[in-house]
Structure formats: structure tokens, C-alpha cells
């Protein structure tokens, strides 16, 4: 079973913690990771883009000038794509980009992402701030030399969230909001011991 250090928020190691091998010690499945990340990014897209084709633009029903004898190029409509205020060629239309991923693949991707972050994981014995204080959050991050950090708490913690939300490259979320993209996108994964237990309950 993987074993990592257990730290307090001052950066001092206070013990070790055994991680569940079914969650933090699996073989990393790159295919599942790719599929889930692509789906997650696709599902973020609004798909509300829209433009008018030449048939949808108002006007342009009459031929602007006769076909021959003017010396100018022949034209059939002032709403053709080459005209100013003309329609758009292959105009984008609203569409649904959503992708569905099987539950089993989502689980494989999540355990693969967690396993890939064990080497960059900092498990905290506890994480609380008496009041929202960015200085305290910066002090904690500096103690671990953390860069581009994802902080995972067991529950929604307003003081922790407000303390870290203004720090560039730091994301805070409760354990029930974790996702594959954010796990892979961080360089340091900072997680509380209670959050680790909750993850193991769900994915073991």
C-alpha cells in the first residue's frame, strides 16, 4: 500500500498515512484519462454560437444589376458572402457538445488521476483558519514550496476558500467536487486526511 507523510499546515511532518491501493495505487489508464478530460472540457462549452447564412440575412432578394453589359462582375444578391453585410459561408449554429462517459470509465480515470498525483501529494492532518486570511494561506503554501496547487477539503470551508481564492494558481474545492481535469492540471495536490478517507470510501 502506498504510504505518504502526514503534515500540519506549518509544513512539519507529524506522521505517515497508508493510502488505499485500490484508489492510490492502480495502473494509470491514459486512455480513460484522455476520454474523461476531453468530455469534461466539451461539456463546459456553451454551444450558443450562431451566425446567419445568405438565406437567413434580411434583404438581397433582387439581383443588384443586370447580368451583362455593365462591365462589373455578375452578382445575384447583395447578401452573398463576398458582400459587406452578406451571409456567412457555413455559418456556425447552436449545437450540443455534451459527451457522456460510462460510470466505470469515470471511476478508472479518477483512480488513475489520484494515483498519478501520489508523488506530488501533501496530506494535511487538518486545515482550518480562524478567519479568512490570505497571508496565512500564502505562509502555508510557502512552507511546502507549493506551485499551482489544488487544495481539497472534506467539506465546504469558507475560511479556507476565502483565504486562498485570491492567490494565483491556487484552487480550493470540497471533496465532492473533485474532477479529473483539475487533478491532472495541478502541480501540488494538497488534501486533508478526512478528505482522503472520503475519497477511499467512494472509490475503493
Curated annotation (Swiss-Prot):
Keyword presence, Ribonucleoprotein: yes
GO CC annotation, single: ribosome
InterPro entries: Ribosomal_uL4, Ribosomal_uL4-like, Ribosomal_uL4_dom_sf
Protein's GO biological process: translation
Entry-linked Gene3D superfamilies: 3.40.1370.10
Stretches the record annotates as Disordered: 44-76
Function: One of the primary rRNA binding proteins, this protein initially binds near the 5'-end of the 23S rRNA. It is important during the early stages of 50S assembly. It makes multiple contacts with different domains of the 23S rRNA in the assembled 50S subunit and ribosome.
Protein name: Large ribosomal subunit protein uL4
Organism listed in the record: Clostridium perfringens (strain ATCC 13124 / DSM 756 / JCM 1290 / NCIMB 6125 / NCTC 8237 / Type A)
Amino acid at each position: 500500500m502506498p504510504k505518504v507523510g502526514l503534515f500540519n499546515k506549518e509544513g512539519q511532518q507529524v506522521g505517515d498515512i497508508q493510502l488505499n491501493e485500490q484508489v492510490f495505487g492502480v495502473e494509470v489508464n491514459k486512455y480513460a484519462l484522455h476520454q474523461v478530460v476531453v468530455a469534461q472540457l466539451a461539456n463546459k462549452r456553451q454551444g450558443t454560437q450562431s451566425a446567419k447564412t445568405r438565406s437567413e440575412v434580411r434583404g438581397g432578394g433582387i439581383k443588384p444589376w443586370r447580368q451583362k453589359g455593365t462591365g462589373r462582375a455578375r452578382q445575384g444578391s447583395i447578401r452573398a458572402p463576398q458582400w459587406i453585410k452578406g451571409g456567412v459561408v457555413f455559418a456556425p449554429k447552436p449545437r450540443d457538445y455534451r459527451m457522456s462517459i460510462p460510470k466505470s470509465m469515470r471511476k478508472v480515470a479518477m483512480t488513475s488521476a489520484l494515483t498519478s498525483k501520489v508523488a506530488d501529494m501533501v496530506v494535511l492532518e487538518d486545515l482550518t483558519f480562524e478567519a479568512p486570511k490570505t497571508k496565512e494561506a500564502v505562509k502555508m503554501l510557502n512552507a511546502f514550496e507549493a506551485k499551482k496547487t489544488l487544495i481539497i477539503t472534506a467539506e465546504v470551508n469558507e475560511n479556507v476558500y476565502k483565504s486562498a481564492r485570491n492567490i494565483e494558481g491556487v484552487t480550493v474545492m470540497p471533496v465532492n467536487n473533485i474532477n479529473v481535469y483539475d487533478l491532472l492540471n495541478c502541480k501540488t495536490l494538497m488534501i486533508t486526511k478526512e478528505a482522503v478517507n472520503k475519497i477511499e470510501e467512494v472509490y475503493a
